[in-house]
Amino acid sequence: MIEKIWSGESPLWRLLLPLSWLYGLVSGAIRLCYKLKLKRAWRAPVPVVVVGNLTAGGNGKTPVVVWLVEQLQQRGIRVGVVSRGYGGKAESYPLLLSADTTTAQAGDEPVLIYQRTDAPVAVSPVRSDAVKAILAQHPDVQIIVTDDGLQHYRLARDVEIVVIDGVRRFGNGWWLPAGPMRERAGRLKSVDAVIVNGGVPRSGEIPMHLLPGQAVNLRTGTRCDVAQLEHVVAMAGIGHPPRFFATLKMCGVQPEKCVPLADHQSLNHADVSALVSAGQTLVMTEKDAVKCRAFAEENWWYLPVDAQLSGDEPAKLLTQLTSLASGN
């Protein structure tokens, strides 16, 4: 229902306009206060890069963060990552992730990013505290990448990158809750790079596609072509589950059942195992896998995806960030 409201297919969005106007006024006032320096943002002693979005829901932001961190690491840059830690609840903040940190403590995306990149990752509702925690433990870090937080103006940033779903784009264009917008589309004029996940990019936008890798068994780590798996039940607890189901079909998999779950939904063995019957194979997203690995069964697999950016702009962006991190 919410997708129909946000896309404008349902007339119910008009009923929510008063709340959207209120949301827009408050969010605009907050940004203006920081812009006019009525409120002071905290500036880190190293450059900060924000990877965020203008809309609620999954846009492919986390794969972009992983891509960015890995690309900078390959260039010899030491990177730290901070996040709000949505879906997690730590005993205290800031929380610096370790091999023992669970998604219940830190949230799905931070654990995924930590496991993928081995970069220092910290979470806190106050992102400046997360930055301070990383720099205290890892003083060699040269640049901070923040996963989400475009609207978290308390943390000063040097570079802003926005990720857009190229198919859904901005829906009906309205602020939450009548539409999907956290900020209006005009905000794109002030960011440094716009990355478009799928669809047809517009002038000045960087095209991106999510490339699936081999399926990975949660228990054994065995890899295989996902099309070799039989009697597949697909599960996705991400911002936009249909994207994952479409990826499976693109890989030649015709799931016997597709199970969309809420983003950041907590998972347990009983609930997940109930999704599959004898002889079926469960295939989930990598984001779900970080929550299920501790209690996984032998017929549970996940499909990792990697961001692939096209054109000349990604190289220019990486050159800019490398120069910033190197102090040039």
Swiss-Prot record:
Q: Per the UniProt record, which EC number(s) apply here?
A: 2.7.1.130
The answer to keyword Kinase applying to this record is yes
Q: Which residues bind ATP?
A: 55-62
GO biological process entries: lipid A biosynthetic process; lipopolysaccharide core region biosynthetic process
Q: Which InterPro entries match?
A: LpxK, P-loop_NTPase
Q: Which GO terms describe its cellular component?
A: plasma membrane
- From the UniProt record, list the reaction(s) this protein catalyses: a lipid A disaccharide + ATP = a lipid IVA + ADP + H(+)
The organism's superkingdom is given as Bacteria
Keywords, in A-Z order: ATP-binding, Kinase, Lipid A biosynthesis, Lipid biosynthesis, Lipid metabolism, Nucleotide-binding, Transferase
State one molecular function term (GO). ATP binding
| Stretches of the chain forming a coiled coil according to its record | none
SUPFAM superfamilies referenced in this protein's UniProt entry, alphabetically: P-loop containing nucleoside triphosphate hydrolases
> What is the annotated role of this protein in its UniProt record?
Transfers the gamma-phosphate of ATP to the 4'-position of a tetraacyldisaccharide 1-phosphate intermediate (termed DS-1-P) to form tetraacyldisaccharide 1,4'-bis-phosphate (lipid IVA).
Q: Which family does it belong to?
A: Belongs to the LpxK family.
Record's NCBIfam families? lpxK
HAMAP family per UniProt: LpxK
Protein name, UniProt field: Tetraacyldisaccharide 4'-kinase
The gene designation is lpxK
